[in-house]
Amino acid sequence: AHASDRDLTNFRREHVGFVFQFYNLIPSLTARENVALITELAPDPMEPEEALHLVGLSARMDHFPAQLSGGEQQRVAIARAIAKRPSVLLCDEPTGALDIRTGMVVLEAIEHINRELGTLTMVITHNAVIADMADRVLTLSDGHITHERRNPQRASVTSLAW
């Protein structure tokens, strides 16, 4: 089936949440305001407070990005992505710029979102350890799938061997 550029844009806007390696937060807006931006575009968004609660940032929602740690900023970015209740969540290197402990907090937040919202979550990473959390793992090389496997037993974040 072929879709127009407009149809694809509308699909992405309504059904896909993006979490980038670099958080792309607006420095002059609080965490709550950064999340609220996306809710203006979505047909049935959750309240920014609910999204921030889901990632464990209820107490930090009125802080500006410069007042947040790297892990907290990444969780604001996740909250912003999930506030529109996407059916697909794409995460590009969500732990790439974080230390191990903070990376684990971010992965736990993503895992929680996946469970709570039933969101199909795709994580793009160079960290092979994270693959043990997935139902299905695809390995890419030069833009092509070179290997595929399924995990019969998904690992929890706390059981990962960093």
Residue positions per predicted region:
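ABC family nucleotide-binding domain
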Residues: 1-134, 139-140
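Conserved beta-strand-loop-alpha-helix hinge in the C-terminal portion
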Residues: 136, 144-162
